[in-house]
Design a protein with these regions (language model features):
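Glycine-rich, flexible loop/turn motifs
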Residues: 12, 16, 75, 164, ...
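N-terminal intrinsically disordered, cationic/polar leader segments
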Residues: 136, 154, 158-166, 170, ...
């Protein structure tokens, strides 16, 4: 099966965060690590649900974005988007497991549908269960911190203000070394 190879080599985005070869795997592992932390520190969290959702939350990106060197949106990506594609994949995977609990399937699908947190950020649903909120927070934190890392790496030795950044709605600079 080509899926594991594609997953390892795929980017997590065309641009913005983790838009490099292997970015999808790096992002997925970072999000999963954060979710593991949440599950350890908040006993109400259903650990298996959250970790499964973390591992598969961006699976739809394999169909949404073409492989390198193109790394551009596919027709499925333009028409459907990775959230819908990922939710559909999760439903199909659960259907292959005999007696998979329907409520658990819906909760997994909900986590994928809600992982961007807000409808204006592309989520068709906002988080309604603790695991969906934890996944959203981990996904958002990793995406933003990686984006800042990329911005500051591009700035090189520039320790001054870098100018207004639309994504962060702020003028940015690196932390001083003092």
């Amino acid at each position: 099966d080509a899926l594991p190879i594609s997953f390892k080599k795929h980017s997590a985005a065309k641009s913005v965060h983790h838009g490099f070869m292997g970015g999808l795997l790096e992002h997925t592992l970072s999000v999963t690590d954060m979710c593991q932390y949440f599950a350890e520190h908040y006993p109400m969290i259903h650990r298996d649900l959250l970790i499964t959702a973390a591992l598969f939350h961006d699976m739809g990106k394999i169909q949404e974005i073409s492989d390198f060197p193109m790394n551009d949106y596919t027709d499925d990506g333009q028409l459907l988007g990775h959230i819908y594609i990922g939710a559909r994949c999760m439903e199909n995977a659960a259907a292959q497991i005999p007696n998979f609990p329907p409520k658990l399937k819906n909760e997994l699908v909900h986590c994928i549908l809600a992982h961007h947190g807000k409808m204006e950020f592309g989520s068709p649903k906002v988080p309604a269960i603790m695991e969906a909120m934890a996944l959203h927070m981990a996904d958002n934190a990793d995406a933003k911190l990686q984006t800042l890392t990329e911005v500051f790496t591009q700035a090189g030795d520039n320790m001054g203000w870098l100018g207004f950044n639309r994504m962060f709605e702020s003028n940015l600079r690196k932390t001083s070394e003092e």
